[in-house]
Swiss-Prot record:
Residues at which S-adenosyl-L-methionine binds: 53, 75, 77-78, 83, 101, 130, 152, 154, 161
Signal peptide bounds: none
Reaction it catalyzes: (E)-caffeoyl-CoA + S-adenosyl-L-methionine = (E)-feruloyl-CoA + S-adenosyl-L-homocysteine + H(+)
Domain of life: Eukaryota
PROSITE patterns according to UniProt: SAM_OMT_I (PS51682)
Annotated binding of a divalent metal cation, by residue: 152, 178-179
EC code(s) of this entry: 2.1.1.104
Keywords associated with the record: Metal-binding, Methyltransferase, S-adenosyl-L-methionine, Transferase
Classification via SUPFAM superfamilies: S-adenosyl-L-methionine-dependent methyltransferases
Protein name, as recorded: Probable caffeoyl-CoA O-methyltransferase 2
Enzyme class: transferase
Amino acid sequence: MEQKTAPTQYEVKVQYNNSILNYAIDHSDQLTDIQKELIQFTKENIERHIMLTQAEQCSFFKLLIQVLNAKKTIDIGVFTGLSSLTAALAMGDEGRVVACDVSTEYTQHALKFWAKAGVDHKINLKIQPASKTLQELIDQGEENTYDFVFIDADKTGYDTYYELSLKLIRKGGIIAIDNVLQHGRVADPNANVEPNLVAIRALNDKILADKRVTKSLLPIADGITLITKIN
């Protein structure tokens, strides 16, 4: 009788805490003064500041964008503009960011910080459903031309954004998907099942089985999946 092999169980090597997180951030490329100012403004003035991209993500994305020599990026979910600002700062003057959001409530602040940083000419803010913006880019013949896409918006829309982004990203480009651990709830069988968790679990399973891409789910911040398409 064939014996089944038990799943490999992995262990955390380091028990992370705030001291270790700050040590890691301090030993990475530092945020610019304008990035720090945007973070401080958001924490002090925006009730939902938890939605802000984390500092460790910013230095990581800067590295990815520069390794890719990226010139065309997409930011799905702008909030107060930190991720778009990070992408714009990481690229040369020819770099462009298509920034997708549905509301001006928070992006009105983003516009001010982008201008203050001198990168507003690099960022094209589209206030409409991201799915519409992505489809418009496809219809304009921009398939397989984008270097980097960051998805951090409504979780129930992630599957649509993933599929459209796969059409737009070039071979060798990277799609980064945020919040794929849902504060650890994805691995908790007793977690309260609600639409966001259902959507993220389904997408994680879909990407795992997706033969079109190479993928790695990293426990950075609230979890980031990095994807590059094979063909």
